[in-house]
Curated annotation (Swiss-Prot):
Superkingdom assignment: Bacteria
Enzyme class per UniProt: hydrolase
G1, as annotated region: 19-26
Binding sites annotated in the UniProt record for Mg(2+): 26
Main subcellular location: cytoplasm
Family the UniProt entry places it in: Belongs to the TRAFAC class translation factor GTPase superfamily. Classic translation factor GTPase family. EF-Tu/EF-1A subfamily.
Stated role: GTP hydrolase that promotes the GTP-dependent binding of aminoacyl-tRNA to the A-site of ribosomes during protein biosynthesis.
Compartments reported by the entry: Cytoplasm
UniProt organism field: Prochlorococcus marinus (strain NATL2A)
PROSITE patterns xref list: G_TR_1, G_TR_2
Region of interest (G5), ranges: 174-176
Protein name: Elongation factor Tu
Length: 399
């Protein structure tokens, strides 16, 4: 089947749904597609399609990050539905890293829960610049005062994590009732999208910098070759261009023979696009998640760096005990965990400390077991046993 060309006539914005498990993120995502489909601005998708993670569906948990697309009057959106369950924070980090803004879904029946807080913290860590709150399941709460209390609580919570809690729009919605076609609740979905259009700033694309895409997934297409998927972080890539594969193993050169987005062919992919790149002469085994595709000669992999790190408090889901020099966690860099060692540290004011306590801010020297495309100013998470225990930024490359 010939694939249609992707029309690029509106600004493109990446957003997603975040929030506590069972607060209705996936239902709301389905409701947005359904309401916008009535105006011809989306293809309606039902809950099961978006929730398409068969291996975990039985337990009612969404694992995989689902991608949907839709348009409003002024924008084209790519929307990721991020899993809510704490076990899938790893996916949340890769998903949230792809967001220019997020819709924080909070059930009016419950208010803020543990993962609501965890996701707000993660949004802060991975640099999600703006949030809009969807107060969901409002059809189930008769008492207007109750809804107002939940709204106040959410605003205070956002402010405590350095988001502008007083200014962030809070829209009362019911994903379920909107899907069922109740006109008043459909209007609320329109209100939500109006708030998203107005409050999530159009991202400044990094289009003029050298091309870089972190690889999220790799698969083979019979008769065509190997495809690497991911979000283009910066720059642009055109069909026929030579790119380097950097990180984990020795750097290799390849040619991009195809660029696809939402199953449509493009002449080029640019910063902010979620694309699949077809690579010449590369086997599926040659590349893996965590490597990056970059403009030839623009980046070299490193193993040693200095970073500024905030170590999460116990209450934020961090460690309960201190750690010492020589500590070996995972460093979550772009799309993958890399084992490393914190070889030395001082407190953030430069004074010597013997150990690092949960809640501390430190300057640290880290050394990775495999070379990765790390850069100054880049953010990373420090993780242990599948949970985030620290958030940091690379302050200096050593080697």
């Amino acid at each position: 089947m010939a694939r249609e060309k992707f029309e690029r006539n509106k600004p493109h914005v990446n957003i997603g749904t975040i929030g506590h498990v069972d607060h209705g993120k996936t239902t709301l995502t389905a409701a947005i597609t359904k309401v916008l489909a009535k105006k011809g601005q989306a293809e309606a998708q039902d809950y099961a399609e978006i929730d398409g993670a068969p291996e975990e569906r039985e337990r009612g948990i969404t694992i995989n990050t689902a991608h949907v697309e839709y348009e409003t009057e002024g924008r084209h959106y790519a929307h990721v539905d991020c899993p809510g369950h704490a076990d899938y924070v790893k996916n949340m980090i890769t998903g949230a890293a792809q967001m220019d803004g997020a819709i924080l879904v909070v059930a009016a029946t419950d208010g803020a829960m543990a993962q609501t807080k965890e996701h707000i913290l993660l949004a802060k860590q991975v640099g999600v610049p703006a949030l809009v709150v969807a107060l969901n399941k409002c059809d189930m709460v008769d008492d207007e005062e109750m809804i107002e209390l939940v709204e106040m609580e959410i605003r205070e919570l956002l402010t405590s994590y350095d988001f502008p809690g007083d200014d962030i729009p809070v829209v009362q919605v019911s994903g379920l009732k909107a899907i069922e076609g109740e006109a008043d609740w459909e209007t609320k979905i329109d209100d939500l999208m109006t708030a998203v259009d107005a409050s999530i700033p159009e991202p400044e694309r990094e289009i003029d910098k050298p091309f870089l895409m972190a690889i999220e997934d790799v698969f083979s297409i019979t008769g065509r070759g190997t495809v690497a998927t991911g979000r283009i972080e910066r720059g642009k890539v055109t069909v026929g261009e030579e790119v380097e594969i950097v990180g984990i193993r020795d750097t290799r050169l390849t040619t991009v023979t195809g660029v696809e987005m939402f199953r449509k062919l493009l002449d080029e992919g640019m910063a902010g696009d979620n694309v699949g790149l077809l690579l010449r002469g590369i086997q599926k085994e040659d590349i893996e998640r965590g490597m990056v595709l970059v403009k030839k000669g623009s980046i070299t992999p490193h193993t040693k760096f200095e970073g500024e790190v905030y170590v999460l408090k116990k209450e934020e889901g961090g460690r309960h005990t201190p750690f010492f020099a020589g500590y070996r966690p995972q460093f979550y860099i772009r799309t993958t965990d890399v084992t490393g060692q914190i070889t030395a540290f001082t407190s953030d004011d430069g004074s010597n400390v013997e150990m690092v306590m949960p809640g501390d801010r430190i300057k640290m020297t880290g050394e990775l077991i495999a070379p990765v495309a790390i850069e100054q100013g880049m953010r990373f998470a420090i993780r242990e046993g599948g949970r985030t225990i620290g958030a940091g930024v690379v302050s200096k490359i050593i080697e």
